[in-house]
């Protein structure tokens, strides 16, 4: 036990977490040089393509330290993106310490701060590491001061390394062996094992990643899931060295994987406690706080035959991704599907892409919305996550929208641009502090504005230097309206959006123009209108395609021409009564891009 070290690597996006973990694996000889690949832990295709870490991964390595002792390192590589912060908090719950990796060129960023505070709240030992010192732009002295100034941990003797070239990585390992405490726990007590993560394997069923807090887990033990009371048999267990390696025993303080032939996806929820059936622990371990989804969107299969497959896929994915929320929903325009809750737009994109890739589905997504709090005239409080569920305007006493507290860190020269952007997004400034060349800004901005495109716009106004961390604070009363889209006087429920009355006119007009470009021309006029209640605020028409019926008349009598035109007109009129309009997938996504390219 004294030789075990459990730690995570936390950092902002692109500060070199995954590369550093590659080097640590190489030094400890977890893989032969032939098996080594760049970012060996980012095993999903999607992670490799986008160059980001999405799922936290764990590895167990043996390291012979300079003091001659053999240490067992269990470490978990975590994502840096704000949308995946729950992955980070789950990983940290299984550790005693964390490496805080900071890019020596870019310095401290908002996400570094947020993840570091999460670690400090859980009483972990945080070891600062300055990475990328091989870059010409690196200023380790300045960044060390910045860490002290902004984060508040002593970084004067922070380890300096370059994960890419491998300089100083040995020192990083030595430092963490010294500074991070050994796990606490008692191997003689009843078993308590925390489920950190689980995923679905087509051959093995549910595979869980567990951290043994007390007791020991042996192969063949009968184990009990504490929240459901179900009893299973521990068929196989082992560790990752990134490869799966079977073991017979997982000792106290270790992190490993476990297969016990659970077929049911809800059999072993993440954050649950496992114990022995014959001598159960008295109380479960404190799990993780449930993450509330911030963004909701409807997901519908393109062909309704895929509905069953889609439901299974969502089930398997939600096992692997504890923050995904979903419930069945039906729409008159799109048929049956699910209303899903996500942590942010990136999370939504990733989930949609994983569903389409890993499960071969074709999906249509409706525009994302946030949750609104509605007080009706009969003084009931409702929570509405989709525009179509909003009660009629005259039944609403008060509509409250969620407000997000946004912490931004940016260089001084971009301050003006960023403040302009925040004001445009209806933000209210609550705090501003200067740290050397950096400015820390705090704004309260409506969640709806943050999830739409705030992050992208923030990056582009600051040339990528600003960083953002946001969290939900409260609901605040606001003048919101629902804008409906009518196509040939029929409401399309999937296209409705909730927006602030001040922006409604503009958003409505923009959306209608966008739809006009996307809907293909038919044999009759298509009227596209945006309306608030019964009040039309914008309209445009997709013009009909007309055959030139007069082409065959040479000169001749005007009444002949009139007759032909009249006949065409009547035909068009009849067509319009029976014709219906097919909306392309792009049309549903048009709402996302309203107000982006102005």
Curated annotation (Swiss-Prot):
Main location class: membrane
Keywords: Cell inner membrane, Cell membrane, GTP-binding, Hydrolase, Membrane, Nucleotide-binding, Protein biosynthesis
Cystine pairings recorded for this chain: none
Gene Ontology terms for molecular function: GTP binding; GTPase activity; guanosine tetraphosphate binding; ribosome binding; translation elongation factor activity
Catalytic class of the enzyme: hydrolase
GO cellular component, one term: plasma membrane
Biological process per Gene Ontology, one example term: positive regulation of translation
Catalysed reaction equations from the record: GTP + H2O = GDP + phosphate + H(+)
Residue ranges of every copy of the tr-type G domain listed in the record: 2-184
Entry's EC annotation: 3.6.5.n1
A Pfam match: EFG_C
InterPro entries documented for this protein: EF-4, EFG_III/V, EFG_V-like, EFTu-like_2, G_TR_CS, LepA_C_sf, LepA_CTD, LepA_IV
Positions with a binding annotation for GTP: 14-19, 131-134
Cellular localisation: Cell inner membrane
Transmembrane segments annotated in the record for this chain: none
Similarity comment: family membership: Belongs to the TRAFAC class translation factor GTPase superfamily. Classic translation factor GTPase family. LepA subfamily.
Function: Required for accurate and efficient protein synthesis under certain stress conditions. May act as a fidelity factor of the translation reaction, by catalyzing a one-codon backward translocation of tRNAs on improperly translocated ribosomes. Back-translocation proceeds from a post-translocation (POST) complex to a pre-translocation (PRE) complex, thus giving elongation factor G a second chance to translocate the tRNAs correctly. Binds to ribosomes in a GTP-dependent manner.
Record-linked PANTHER family: TRANSLATION FACTOR GUF1 HOMOLOG, CHLOROPLASTIC, TRANSLATION FACTOR GUF1-RELATED
HAMAP family membership: LepA
Name of the protein this chain belongs to: Elongation factor 4
Organism: Photorhabdus laumondii subsp. laumondii (strain DSM 15139 / CIP 105565 / TT01) (Photorhabdus luminescens subsp. laumondii)
Gene that encodes it: lepA
């Amino acid at each position: 036990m004294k030789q075990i070290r459990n730690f995570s690597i936390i950092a902002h996006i692109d500060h070199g977490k995954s590369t550093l973990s590659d080097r640590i694996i190489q030094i400890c000889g977890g893989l032969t040089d032939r098996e080594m690949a760049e970012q060996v832990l980012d095993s999903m295709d999607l992670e490799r393509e986008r160059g980001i870490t999405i799922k936290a991964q764990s590895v167990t390595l043996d390291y012979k330290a300079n003091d001659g002792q053999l240490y067992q390192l269990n470490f978990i590589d975590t994502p840096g993106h704000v949308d995946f912060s729950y992955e980070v908090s789950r990983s940290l719950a299984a550790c005693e310490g964390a490496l805080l990796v900071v890019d020596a060129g870019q310095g401290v960023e908002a996400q570094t701060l947020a993840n570091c505070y999460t670690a400090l709240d859980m009483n972990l030992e945080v070891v600062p590491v300055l990475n990328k010192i091989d870059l010409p732009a690196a200023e380790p002295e300045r960044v060390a001061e910045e860490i002290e100034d902004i984060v508040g941990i002593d970084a004067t003797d922070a380890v300096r390394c370059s994960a890419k070239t491998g300089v100083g990585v040995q020192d990083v390992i030595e430092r963490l062996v010294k500074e991070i405490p050994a796990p606490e726990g008692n191997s003689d007590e009843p078993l308590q094992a925390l489920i950190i993560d689980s995923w679905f394997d087509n051959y093995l069923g549910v595979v869980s990643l567990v951290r043994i807090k007390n007791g020991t887990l042996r192969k063949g033990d009968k184990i009990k899931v504490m929240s459901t009371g179900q009893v299973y048999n521990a068929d196989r267990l082992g560790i990752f060295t990134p490869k799966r390696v079977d073991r017979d025993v997982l000792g106290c303080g270790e992190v490993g994987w476990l297969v016990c032939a659970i077929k049911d996806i809800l059999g072993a929820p993440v954050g649950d406690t496992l114990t022995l059936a014959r001598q159960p622990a008295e109380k479960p371990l404190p799990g993780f706080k449930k993450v509330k989804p911030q963004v909701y969107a409807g997901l519908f299969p393109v062909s309704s035959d895929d509905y069953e497959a889609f439901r299974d896929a969502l089930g398997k994915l939600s096992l692997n991704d504890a923050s995904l929320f979903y419930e069945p929903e039906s729409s008159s325009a799109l048929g049956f599907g699910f209303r899903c809750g996500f942590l942010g737009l990136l999370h939504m994109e990733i989930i949609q892409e994983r569903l389409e890739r890993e499960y071969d589905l074709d999906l249509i997504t409706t525009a994302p919305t946030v949750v609104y709090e509605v007080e009706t005239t009969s003084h009931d409080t409702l929570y509405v996550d989709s525009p179509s569920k909003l009660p009629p305007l005259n039944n609403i006493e008060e509509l409250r929208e969620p407000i997000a507290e946004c912490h931004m860190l940016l260089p001084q020269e971009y301050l003006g641009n960023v403040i302009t952007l925040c004001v445009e997004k209806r933000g209210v400034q609550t705090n501003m502090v200067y740290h050397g060349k950096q400015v820390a800004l705090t704004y309260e901005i409506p969640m709806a504005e943050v999830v739409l495109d705030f992050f992208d716009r923030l990056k582009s106004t600051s040339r990528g230097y600003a960083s953002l961390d946001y969290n939900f604070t409260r609901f605040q009363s606001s003048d919101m309206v629902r804008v409906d889209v009518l196509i040939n006087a029929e409401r399309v429920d999937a296209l409705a959006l909730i927006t602030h009355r001040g922006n409604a006119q503009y958003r409505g007009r923009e959306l209608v123009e966008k739809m006009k470009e996307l809907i293909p021309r038919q044999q009759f006029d298509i009227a596209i209108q945006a309306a608030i209640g019964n009040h039309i605020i914008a309209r445009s028409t997709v013009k009909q395609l007309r055959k030139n019926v007069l082409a065959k008349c040479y000169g001749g009598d005007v009444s002949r021409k009139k007759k032909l035109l009249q006949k065409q007109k009547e035909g068009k009129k009849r067509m319009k009564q029976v014709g219906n309009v097919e909306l392309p997938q792009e049309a549903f996504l048009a709402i996302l891009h309203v107000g982006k390219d102005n």
